[in-house]
């Protein structure tokens, strides 16, 4: 079945359609990860986006439910060069084509993804449709103008989860990955709270953590979270990962900006000036270095100098994903350092 990728710059690319027959729309971005396709597709940070896999071969190993980062696929569609759509079923009991059909996710195969990635790198992220009919797609609204966090979070409200640690963390869930929650529970007990919760009404916690998530960190719907963090700077230890770093930086008075094509993949090197860490990234926004105030920039991306870690006396946040999944475990020390700082603050 022929299917088309229609982009906001007027490009129309024909390919083979699989997955759901629905029309998909979103911001067109790419990942350079060569493995972890199911983890990427179920990562809530991809809400509102169509994901191009730079790796030419996708779905060449079985689908395993245990690696899913949320209950459902979160991307708006996928673009592949050579997808093994009829790969024998894994623990999900489905081949790739049937899995995407059941999830309501459209996909297009046979695309020159190398050319498409170069196009995005040179011109910046695009907006795109995946559709069976190439005609009638002239409206390309900005998905980042939506409240994507509301679509990314699987559970609303406040929930207590007992972990292996005694210290309790107020975990502000903006679209967290399962692996991240699991790693946090290895060190702490969590008070899970969605962004629309009354955060000021929650008490009896030792530190605050802000999770990853999708969209524009300066979206009006997130202003209550930013203001809550402002009120707690210097009061409670504050930690964050990925989107969480950007939210924390806004609370400190810094600004964020939209990157040309972002960082998405499991092979991004960052440095603190002494050591180099290979890390997993998934972000299309970053902190404006000209607006840094009241905190120290500890790590930067080796390739483009993007701010990748910030800290002050009671705050620490990274732009990358130390929990990885997929990706390297070079920076899992972040969780131990969180625990140490939380313990020190609790002891006064």
UniProtKB/Swiss-Prot annotation:
GO terms for biological process: 'de novo' pyrimidine nucleobase biosynthetic process; 'de novo' UMP biosynthetic process; glutamine metabolic process; L-arginine biosynthetic process. One of its GO terms (molecular function) is carbamoyl-phosphate synthase (glutamine-hydrolyzing) activity. Residues 168-348 form the Glutamine amidotransferase type-1 domain. Pathway: Amino-acid biosynthesis; L-arginine biosynthesis; carbamoyl phosphate from bicarbonate: step 1/1; Pyrimidine metabolism; UMP biosynthesis via de novo pathway; (S)-dihydroorotate from bicarbonate: step 1/3. Its EC number is 6.3.5.5. The active site is at 242 (nucleophile), 321, 323. It catalyses: hydrogencarbonate + L-glutamine + 2 ATP + H2O = carbamoyl phosphate + L-glutamate + 2 ADP + phosphate + 2 H(+). Keywords: Amino-acid biosynthesis, Arginine biosynthesis, ATP-binding, Glutamine amidotransferase, Ligase, Nucleotide-binding, Pyrimidine biosynthesis. Residues 1-167 are annotated as: CPSase. L-glutamine binds at residues 45, 213, 215, 243, 246, 282, 284-285. Gene3D superfamilies: 3.40.50.880, Carbamoyl-phosphate synthase small subunit, N-terminal domain (3.50.30.20). InterPro entries: Anth_synth/Amidotransfase, CarbamoylP_synth_ssu, CarbamoylP_synth_ssu_N, CarbP_synth_ssu_N_sf, Class_I_gatase-like, CPSase_GATase1, GATASE. HAMAP family: CPSase_S_chain (MF_01209). Small subunit of the glutamine-dependent carbamoyl phosphate synthetase (CPSase). CPSase catalyzes the formation of carbamoyl phosphate from the ammonia moiety of glutamine, carbonate, and phosphate donated by ATP, constituting the first step of 2 biosynthetic pathways, one leading to arginine and/or urea and the other to pyrimidine nucleotides. The small subunit (glutamine amidotransferase) binds and cleaves glutamine to supply the large subunit with the substrate ammonia. Belongs to the CarA family. Composed of two chains; the small (or glutamine) chain promotes the hydrolysis of glutamine to ammonia, which is used by the large (or ammonia) chain to synthesize carbamoyl phosphate. Tetramer of heterodimers (alpha,beta)4. This is Carbamoyl phosphate synthase small chain. The lineage of its organism: Archaea, Methanobacteriati, Thermoplasmatota, Thermoplasmata, Thermoplasmatales.
């Amino acid at each position: 079945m022929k299917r088309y990728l229609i982009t906001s710059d007027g490009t129309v690319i024909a390919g083979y359609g699989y997955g759901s027959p629905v029309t998909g729309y979103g911001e067109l971005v790419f990942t350079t990860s060569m493995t972890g396709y199911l983890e990427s597709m179920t990562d809530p940070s991809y809400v509102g986006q169509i994901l191009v896999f730079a790796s030419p071969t996708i779905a060449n190993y079985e689908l395993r439910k245990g690696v899913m980062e949320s209950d459902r696929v979160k991307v708006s569609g996928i673009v592949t060069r050579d997808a093994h759509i009829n790969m024998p079923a894994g623990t999900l009991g489905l081949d790739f084509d049937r899995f995407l059909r059941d999830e309501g996710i459209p996909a297009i195969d046979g695309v020159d993804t190398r050319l498409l990635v170069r196009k995005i790198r040179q011109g910046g992220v695009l907006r795109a449709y995946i559709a069976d009919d190439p005609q009638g797609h002239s409206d390309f609204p900005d998905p980042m103008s939506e409240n994507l966090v509301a679509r990314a979070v699987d559970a609303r409200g406040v929930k207590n989860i007992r972990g292996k640690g005694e210290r309790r963390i107020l975990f502000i869930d903006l679209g967290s990955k399962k692996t991240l929650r699991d790693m946090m529970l290895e060190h702490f007990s969590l008070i899970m709270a969605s962004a629309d919760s009354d955060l000021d009404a929650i008490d009896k916690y030792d530190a605050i953590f802000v999770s990853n998530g999708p969209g524009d960190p300066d979206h009006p719907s997130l202003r209550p979270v930013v203001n809550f963090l402002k009120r707690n700077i210097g009061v409670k230890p504050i930690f964050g990962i990925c989107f969480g770093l950007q939210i924390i930086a806004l609370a400190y008075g810094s600004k964020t900006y939209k990157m040309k094509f972002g960082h998405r993949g499991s092979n991004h090197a960052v440095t603190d000036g002494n050591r180099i860490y290979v890390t997993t990234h998934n972000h299309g926004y970053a902190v404006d270095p000209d607006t840094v105030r009241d905190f120290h920039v500890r790590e930067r991306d080796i390739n483009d100098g993007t701010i990748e870690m910030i800290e002050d006396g009671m705050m620490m946040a990274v732009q990358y994903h130390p929990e990885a999944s997929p990706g390297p475990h070079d920076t899992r020390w972040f969780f131990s350092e969180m625990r140490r700082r939380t313990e020190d603050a609790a002891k006064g």
